[in-house]
């Protein structure tokens, strides 16, 4: 690569779609293959395989955020046209990742006897097989951690076409190889060996593509200790976020199980798990935006415009979906799970849907903070409200049960959005004019008007399915027409047409 990356709307849109596909396809493969894997392995062995997947996920935190740090600093170098820095950034990060991965593997080897014999409830006849499985799994940890950094190098250059060309098949193989192993009569160690070979192949494919995109990486092998501090400083704050986010997201279910009858955990979890699937789109968009924000860090005006537009696009895409889900929540749950379930979870579903929407919007300023090298601000926001949130969550669950849990989750998402937006507003020097210029203010106004129109019409005419259906259809048609006429500018429309035409080809 001889020149810096040019950040364009059509490129970001195409990459978002690619990332979306990259998350959806393996999900479908998992849904299809898992029943056959369970049938072939049996419940106990499948449980151990599931633990192996979880362990790889947890040990990946040992990369200390260096994968995201690599993406940030390579993208920043591209934005400043400082190509000579990239080999040192990449090799320094990889060396660090390799060391941490080996350390993680050694830790797993040491912990395996304790995990298998004392902590996990493993059947006696499977203890030896489980130990062998975990020992083999330890070899995967450095491979998985290094792969994350190499993938991040490609993401920095907005080469999500190459990333997903590797990521989609490798993610699918995570489920297909156990199925193949079952048909071949393999036990768990054999399946783990197949997965290890696949992961090594994935890592090598990423490395070869990095050599292709950045030829200097192949020619210049350089580990520069000057990069250790910025890499680990950035990655350290990312790690704090990665530790806190699962706690904030999943603590509600633990509290529900403590305060309410255990069945209510299921009522709540089903609503959350279904709605959380909507996070695939903002997650795909955020994955694309992070390196773009880093690349544009030296061009403040373009960075501001991209950030404001990202909020606008998220509002325009997620807003109508959430509106439909809130209006028809009871009908959806009734058809899917029955009237008894719907009566207990409709309001929970509606509140969580609003929370998911606010969380999707909050991902935009959160990614901007990471992109401009301020993940410390994101981590400090999480740290500032974690204890008040825990107290509020506990109080609301005691007072209102699972409705209180949903309310606490949505309030947390709202506070998060306000804090992230406020900090970005201040440090980026945003103003009302740039919100108007890029259509965000009009988008918020129109969406708010549509919500008021829909809710007031339903309140006056009644909540029958016919009234709600006609009202929703009219509101959505108006929203689309107004959006096309007054919110999307010429550049947005050109990007939309170009993206559709590219995908069509």
Residue spans of the language-model regions?
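Helix-loop junctions and terminal segments of transmembrane helices
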Residues: 64-80, 94, 156, 214-216, ...
């Amino acid at each position: 690569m001889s020149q810096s990356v040019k950040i364009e709307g059509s490129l970001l849109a195409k990459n978002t779609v690619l990332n979306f596909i990259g998350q959806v396809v393996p999900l479908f493969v998992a849904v299809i293959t898992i029943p056959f894997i369970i049938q072939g392995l049996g419940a106990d062995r499948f449980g151990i395989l599931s633990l192996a997947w979880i362990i790889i996920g947890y040990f990946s935190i040992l990369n200390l955020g260096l994968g995201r740090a690599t993406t940030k600093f390579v993208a920043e170098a591209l934005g400043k046209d400082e190509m000579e820095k990239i080999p040192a950034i990449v090799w320094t990060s990889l060396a660090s990742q390799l060391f941490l991965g080996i350390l993680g593997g050694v830790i797993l080897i040491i912990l395996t006897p304790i995990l298998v014999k004392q902590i996990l409830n493993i059947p006696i006849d499977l203890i030896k097989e489980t130990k062998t499985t975990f020992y083999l799994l330890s070899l995967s940890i450095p491979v998985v951690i290094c792969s994350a950094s190499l993938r991040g190098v490609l993401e920095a250059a907005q080469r999500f076409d190459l990333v997903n060309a590797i990521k989609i098949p490798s993610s699918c193989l995570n489920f297909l190889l156990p199925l193949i192993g079952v048909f071949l009569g393999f036990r768990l160690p054999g399946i783990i060996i197949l997965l290890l070979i696949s992961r090594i192949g994935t890592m090598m494919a990423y490395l070869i593509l990095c050599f292709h995109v950045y030829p200097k990486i192949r020619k210049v092998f350089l580990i520069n200790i000057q990069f250790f501090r910025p890499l680990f400083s950035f990655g350290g704050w990312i790690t704090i976020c990665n530790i806190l986010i699962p706690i904030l997201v999943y603590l509600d279910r633990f509290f529900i199980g403590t305060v309410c009858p255990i069945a209510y955990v299921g009522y709540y979890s089903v609503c959350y798990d279904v709605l959380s699937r909507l996070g695939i789109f903002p997650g795909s968009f955020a994955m694309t935006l992070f390196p773009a924000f880093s690349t544009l860090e030296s061009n403040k005006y373009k960075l501001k415009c991209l950030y404001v537009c990202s909020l606008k696009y998220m509002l325009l895409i997620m807003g109508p979906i959430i509106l439909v889900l809130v209006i028809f929540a009871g009908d959806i749950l009734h058809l899917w799970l029955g009237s008894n379930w719907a009566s207990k979870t409709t309001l929970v579903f509606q509140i969580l849907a609003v929370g998911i929407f606010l969380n999707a919007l909050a991902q935009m300023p959160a990614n901007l903070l990471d992109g401009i090298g301020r993940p410390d601000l994101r981590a400090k926001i999480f740290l500032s409200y974690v204890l008040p949130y825990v107290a509020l969550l506990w109080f609301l669950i005691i007072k209102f049960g699972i409705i209180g849990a949903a309310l606490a989750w949505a309030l947390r998402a709202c506070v998060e959005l306000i804090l992230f937006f406020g900090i970005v507003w201040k440090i980026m020097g945003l103003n009302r004019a740039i919100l108007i210029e890029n259509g965000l203010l009009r988008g918020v106004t129109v969406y708010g008007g549509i919500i008021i129109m829909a809710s007031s019409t339903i309140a006056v005419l009644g909540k029958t399915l016919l009234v709600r259906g006609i009202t929703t259809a009219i509101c959505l048609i108006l929203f689309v027409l107004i959006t096309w006429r007054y919110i999307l500018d010429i550049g947005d429309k050109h990007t939309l047409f170009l993206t559709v035409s590219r995908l069509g080809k």
